[in-house]
């Protein structure tokens, strides 16, 4: 990262954190964390969708491209007929999924959110209510965001039960949420500039950086409790640099928000890893997390980075319910909760993971160690 890009990130972090911090007066840190990170995720998928949309528009109008739409077949260039056909073609889902871009329906697109957040309750919205031929009616901004999250999940099965849909239930003031949306809208993640200079950063890289920064800030705000889902980047980087996970299966049995996976992918990119479909694509990640909200944070983190993942399909206690019983990983890395006292149950007595003997019932440290060894491939590292 060059000095200009570093300054861009520093200014961006300060700007967005200042905007998000306005919610602290009315929400606990553990709650507003999910509000802000959920909006960042929605901004990411919408920006990625818009990037692909702009790319497609140029391809439709390029005579040299396979997707070219000849104006002569649609009433001529610049005619309403031609523009309508371009617009219709831009709504074809396959153009996006072929590039591993999430399909974002109209009601979940960022510009729609920004504009509709200003509409008074009871007024019509620019889409029909689900299953009806009548326009949906505006309620609150929290409901508007929940509706967007539900729409993204509905259209992208990979994200099912991943996104936070509790904006309305937290009863956050609509004006504060609308202001936060406006602040995020004010930043162009797709075409970043700094001091008049256009930067070569992609929206995925920018939002991934912002997501990581916010996770760290929220962990600090929550104190000791924040350490349950966030391992400091310096520690994560050290472990990844030691193990050097260039390719293969990477497993974290206490994954928190997924920091080890993100750093593994960054390690490959920094050391000349081949790029496939916009990502290095040389590792497959497996993880487990017992806290449902933290599990969602990790899944969103992977989606923002474009990483395929297997988190067992649901949250789960790793020691009590191993969701990857047959996994033998090439790299195992973790920062498990140390000195857990209340972890044992009778069903664990003859568990096959205890390859060196049954661990002490009053402390889970040796249970974690044996669990990790059990899931390590014969030639693996941990």
Task: Report each predicted region and the residues it spans.
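Conserved S-adenosyl-L-methionine
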Residues: 225-334, 339-343, 350
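Non-catalytic, mostly N-terminal accessory regions of nucleic-acid modification and defense proteins
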Residues: 1-246, 310-323
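Conserved Class I SAM-dependent methyltransferase catalytic core
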Residues: 15, 22, 31-44, 239, ...
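Generic recognition of stable, solvent-exposed alpha-helical segments in well-folded globular domains
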Residues: 7, 11-18, 40, 205, ...
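Mobile active-site "lid"/loop adjacent to the S-adenosyl-L-methionine
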Residues: 338-367, 379-381
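Hydrophobic alpha-helical scaffolding
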Residues: 2, 170, 200, 254, ...
């Amino acid at each position: 990262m060059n000095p200009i890009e570093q300054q861009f990130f520093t200014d961006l972090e300060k700007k967005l954190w200042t905007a998000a911090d306005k919610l602290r007066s009315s929400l606990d840190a553990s709650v507003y964390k999910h509000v802000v990170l959920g909006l960042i995720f929605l901004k990411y998928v919408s920006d990625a969708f818009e990037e692909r949309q702009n790319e497609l528009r140029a391809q439709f109008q390029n005579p040299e491209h396979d997707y070219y739409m000849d104006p002569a077949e649609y009433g001529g260039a610049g005619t309403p007929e031609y523009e309508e056909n371009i617009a219709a073609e831009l709504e074809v889902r396959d153009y996006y999924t072929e590039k591993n871009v999430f399909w974002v329906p109209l009601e979940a697109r960022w510009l729609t959110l920004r504009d509709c957040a200003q509409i008074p309750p009871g007024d019509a919205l620019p889409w029909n209510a689900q299953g009806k031929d009548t326009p949906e009616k505006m309620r609150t901004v929290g409901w508007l965001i929940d509706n967007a999250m539900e729409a993204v999940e509905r259209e992208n099965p990979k994200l099912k039960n991943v996104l936070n849909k509790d904006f309305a239930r937290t009863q956050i003031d609509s004006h504060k949420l609308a202001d936060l949306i406006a602040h995020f809208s004010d930043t162009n993640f797709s075409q970043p500039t700094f001091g008049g200079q256009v930067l070569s950063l992609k929206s995925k890289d920018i939002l991934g950086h912002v997501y990581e920064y916010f996770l760290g800030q929220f962990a600090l705000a929550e104190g000791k409790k924040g350490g349950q889902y966030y391992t400091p980047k310096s520690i994560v980087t050290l472990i990844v640099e030691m193990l050097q996970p260039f390719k293969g299966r990477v497993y974290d049995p206490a994954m928190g928000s997924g920091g080890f996976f993100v750093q593994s992918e960054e390690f490959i990119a920094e050391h000349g890893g081949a790029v496939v479909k916009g990502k290095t694509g040389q590792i497959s990640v497996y993880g487990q997390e017992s806290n449902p909200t933290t599990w969602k944070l990790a899944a969103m983190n992977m989606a923002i980075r474009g990483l395929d993942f297997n988190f067992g399909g649901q949250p789960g206690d790793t020691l009590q319910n191993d969701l990857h019983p047959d996994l033998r990983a090439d790299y195992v890395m973790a920062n498990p909760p140390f000195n857990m006292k209340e972890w044992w149950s009778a069903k664990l007595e003859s568990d096959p993971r205890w390859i060196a003997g049954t661990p002490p019932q009053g402390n889970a440290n040796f249970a974690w160690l044996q669990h990790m060894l059990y899931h390590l491939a014969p030639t693996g590292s941990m």
